[in-house]
Amino acid sequence: MTKTMLLATAAAFLMSGAAFAAQAPAPTGPTAPPLSGQAPLDDAAQKGVLVFTPDFFAAQRPNTALDMVDRVPGFSSDDGSGARGFEGAVGNILINGNRPASKNDAGTDVLERTPADKVDHIELIRGGAPGIDMQGYSVVVNVILKQGSSRQSVATWNAALFDGNHDVYGGSYQFTAKDGERSWSVLLSDGTSTSDSNGPGRDVIRDANGVRDQAFANDGWGGGDSARVNYSGPLAGGKLEATAQYGLHDWHEWQDVGAGPDLDHSDYVEDTKSGELGLTYIRPIKPKWTLETRVIHQFEHFDEVATGLQTVGGVAGDAQRFTAKGKSSESILRALVRHERTSALTLEAGGELAYNMLDTDQAYTEGGTPIALPSASVKVEELRGEAFAKGTWRVDPKLTLEGGLRLETSTIKQSGDASAKESFFYAKPRFQATWTPKANHQLRFRFERELGQLDFSDFAASAELDDNTVYGGNVDLAPEQRWISELTFERRFWGEGIVSVGYRHDKIIDVIDRLPLPGGLSATGNIGNGTLDRLSLNIVVPLDRLRFPGGRFTFKNDWNETHVTDPTTGKDRPISDVRPTQANIGVQQDIARWKTQWGINWLPLLGQGTYGPDQINTWRGAGYVESFVEYKPTPTLSLRAQLNLWDDFTIHREVYSNRATRAVLYTEDRDINPVTFVSLKVRKTF
């Protein structure tokens, strides 16, 4: 599959198609389907659930189930945080009422492999529903597949062609066989990785000696070969789902500042080998009682090399070299029992046990001379257990309540250059209320305690030689805690239209950010308490009534404001790596008679800052444009072209000579003109 490392990705604007069909979703229950252009009808018994049948997506002529899900109004797919464990770390996509058997085989990946003609209907579940595991999300989709027998192959070819940088090519082949409740598939993939922020520019450094203006250029690309096998079928009165995958992946990047005799060059290469096995078994144990068990194991071996060399007046300085080699793994055992006590009340309880490990050896040299790093060679292990209970109660057709409690205990042990052992215990309550006072109006409230998971790589040293920065490891990390209060109002109109406004406040305990270490180094660590306030707005306007047939207008943005006390200066500042704003404005259209869709999305402003003890690094982008056109001459063939334009990307770095006084040693301004690139994709089903 194709992986794209986009600075603009957080906007989630990779458009799979264009406007909605001029129909409204059909409700669950024995109600008549709505006429074209009418507002969606709610299930008379459960107003938080809307059902979208294939007719709703007909004008789009979707290729895959993911194309259909991407067009569900009011929903944005999320594959989860990828954090350790299963509970609270997976996505908001269910297939036949359950999540995929593996964490790495994300919901969007499964749907992208599922042909659209295999979808019976899609349920949009807002605020919870009996028998549905929301996993902390306010909104999820449940894709229900058709039964029957079939054999199908899907082949894809894709390319990313850059104006002056490294081009990449990939493709995949999948065979799927289905016979009633039993199915199996094989996927062979030659994937690609790219970055949209590379290109030429200028790098200007200002210090006490004056101004140095130099040329700048960079590039980054990668790919991977993988094979995956999936199976699903009945077993011993229940259903078994299994998946296994093995892959080889690589990433290359380089950066040049200056030219000729005055040149700073850095590069980075990473090679990984990874695999996983996932098993899910679901079985009724008595009327209204269901047992669900999961076993997941995944592993990775990695080898990384980063180098840097500065040449001044034709004389090379001491070469920098940072290497990291190691392995990581995760094993999860999870079981729960679900009791559908009544049609309005579902209770479930269970537990999860997980073991995680990272074993890495790292080294840093300058001119061939080893430089000692804190926690350069470490092994980090975590044994974590969690017990949970939750319930969903549909008080009446207009009101649904969901509540639960998770009790987590974990022990993290570190050995190697530094030894440490810490144990943690946290109670994580959750409450959500969903009120639908009348059709097309919904109010959702959520209160929850979330616990962030520690990134094992933060326990070990690391380097970013493109800006001459080396980080030490930190053995004293503790999880970040958030008390979240969130209120969302949703209003649907014109059948496919929606306006959603949400406000969220996080009280953050033990914020994880950059902190100072002795010896002039810095590391990732806990820097104190902080807050986040977020205003979210999501708008979809169908344009048929405005004489733009098959068209729609979209707007989506999160405005974030964060506060934390800087551990170096003692002053209030934003939390690192949180984007204050990133509006996504788009127009798309289906032209059925031409069997074509087109669209354009614009991000007027994006960016974020990283605040360290010795430097502040901020990047800003403006005027990011992505446009596409997709032609489907037959139901089994699609041709898609996408153009990405971005000519305004700047990085500002302020470096200090003294942590206490914050005296500026120099500033660096990098103005990059990211290269334009075209993405091509051909998909054929046979």
Name each model feature, range by range.
Residues 272-274, 326, 376, 380-382, ...:
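Outer-membrane beta-barrel signature, preferentially recognizing the C-terminal barrel domain
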Residues 301-303, 357-359, 364, 411, ...:
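Surface-exposed extracellular loop regions of Gram-negative outer-membrane beta-barrel proteins
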Residues 631-686:
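C-terminal beta-signal and adjacent terminal beta-strands/loops
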Residues 499, 503-507, 525-610:
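Gram-negative outer-membrane beta-barrel transporters
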Residues 41, 50, 66-103:
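Extracytoplasmic beta-strand/coil segments of soluble accessory domains associated
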Residues 99-126:
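Short acidic/polar hinge/loop motifs at secondary-structure boundaries
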Residues 65-68, 83, 93, 109-110, ...:
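N-terminal periplasmic accessory domains that precede
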